[in-house]
């Protein structure tokens, strides 16, 4: 097919076949991912989850299937910001919209390709206890143990911390948290297989947090 994107796929019997329109499928996945993330943002706005947003604000990331690079991860340029309980975004989600978020997603996917969504929320003792009450699998990392070569390399801290938490825990958990460090706010990161699962987890945390009057 002249001018068409094509890829080679094994039939399963050792005979390769040509699968046309691979680029079209990828673009379809990108469009669905964009719609899913924008819908999630609208749900969070309606639920007024501002009480979960940390001082450094929040971002949400979603990797394409088989994501390999920053441009394969959808995130929000400028992050999600809060005003009281209300939240706002200054831009639509974009692929390659956040290197920091992409580093987390890509590191997670190296261990479990099915886990492609992440969102950071603020850390408090109460929120961590709520995550435990919800029976989430929880892991953590200690920023004070971050190697110097990682610390001085821009954007490497979250990649290192995510890797450390997962390898110590033994699998990809629902929650990865850290207690912060010098000029670093403590944080909880919610992990999920897709945006729908991520929304359910975050709303479960938010609703129990409000119910308990935290």
Would you name each region that the model predicts?
Residues 127-130, 195-201:
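Short, conserved charged micro-motifs
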Residues 122-175:
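Surface-exposed, low-hydrophobicity interaction/linker segments
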């Amino acid at each position: 097919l002249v001018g068409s994107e094509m890829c080679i796929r094994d039939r399963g019997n050792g005979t390769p076949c040509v699968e046309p329109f691979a680029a079209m499928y990828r673009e379809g996945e990108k469009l669905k991912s964009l719609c899913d993330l924008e819908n999630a943002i609208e749900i969070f706005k309606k639920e007024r989850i501002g009480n979960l947003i940390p001082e450094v604000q929040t971002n949400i990331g979603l990797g394409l299937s088989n994501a390999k690079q920053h441009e394969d991860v959808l995130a929000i340029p400028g992050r999600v910001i809060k005003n009281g309980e209300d939240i706002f975004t200054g831009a639509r989600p974009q692929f390659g919209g956040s290197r920091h978020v992409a580093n987390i997603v890509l590191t997670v996917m190296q261990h479990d390709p099915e886990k492609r969504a992440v969102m950071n929320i603020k850390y408090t003792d109460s929120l961590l206890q709520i995550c435990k009450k919800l029976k989430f699998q929880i892991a953590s990392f200690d920023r004070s143990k971050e190697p110097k070569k990682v610390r001085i390399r821009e954007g490497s801290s979250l990649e290192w911390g995510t890797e450390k938490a997962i390898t110590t825990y033994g699998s990809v958990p629902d929650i990865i948290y850290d207690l912060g460090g010098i000029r670093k706010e403590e944080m909880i990161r919610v992990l999920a297989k897709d945006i729908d699962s991520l929304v359910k987890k975050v709303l479960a945390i938010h609703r129990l947090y409000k119910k308990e009057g935290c």
